[in-house]
Amino acid sequence: MSFRDQPLGELALSIPRASALFRKYDMDYCCGGKQTLARAAARKELDVEAIEAELAQLAEQPIEKDWRTAPLAEIIDHIIVRYHDRHREQLPELILQATKVERVHADKPSVPKGLAKYLTMLHQELSSHMMKEEQILFPMIKQGMGSQAMGPISVMESEHDDAGELLEVIKHTTNNVTPPPEACTTWKAMYNGINEMIDDLMEHISLENNVLFPRALAGE
């Protein structure tokens, strides 16, 4: 089956573990979820046929939950518990770890300078963003007023783009979240946590941008 003309966001939702595959190749399936696989591969100078072959293998596995057809209220409840609450736990701990690593290893050329600052910025942006969703947008959608939420949704999508840009800065600061050979246990644990946070945030944004928001605007 050919996947190259399908949007990344759709593939990430319909094929188990496709999101992890796209992350491996640094392909943006959340904020850039509307671009086709062929276009995304061309931009990264990747072999689209090889990626299609990997997707074909993944597509043979059963999908755990197809959020594309789930009720909107169920999607919202899932987003809050699985992503919003998780981000609120993850980021303060990562900020503490980054502050410690930057202080203890300040003399090492490989130290991720500015990481605590960028994680703090992401934490502040997401805290405000998630509160607006939970207090304003999500109740509108649950009350069947999603088709009238074009303004709030466009703001949320813009803030998703801002978060995506901060993730790119964090990846650049951390050598694509790769610890150097001399990294201590805290440093390695922090990078594992950052990778998990990035995976969670990309899945979170993808579910909103590619499923919840379009269906809400369509009047479901």
From Swiss-Prot:
HAMAP family linked to this entry: RIC_YtfE
Pfam families named in the record: Hemerythrin, ScdA_N
Primary residence: cytoplasm
Family: Belongs to the RIC family. YtfE subfamily.
Example of a GO MF term: metal ion binding
Name by which UniProt lists this protein: Iron-sulfur cluster repair protein YtfE
Signal sequence extent: none
Location(s) in or outside the cell: Cytoplasm
Coiled-coil stretches noted in the UniProt entry, renumbered to this chain: none
A GO cellular component entry from the record: cytoplasm
Protein purpose: Di-iron-containing protein involved in the repair of iron-sulfur clusters damaged by oxidative and nitrosative stress conditions.
Subunit composition and interactions: Homodimer.
InterPro entries linked: FeS-repair_YftE (IPR023742), Hemerythrin-like (IPR012312), RIC_family (IPR019903)
Gene Ontology biological-process entries: protein repair; response to nitrosative stress; response to oxidative stress
Keywords: Cytoplasm, Iron, Metal-binding, Stress response
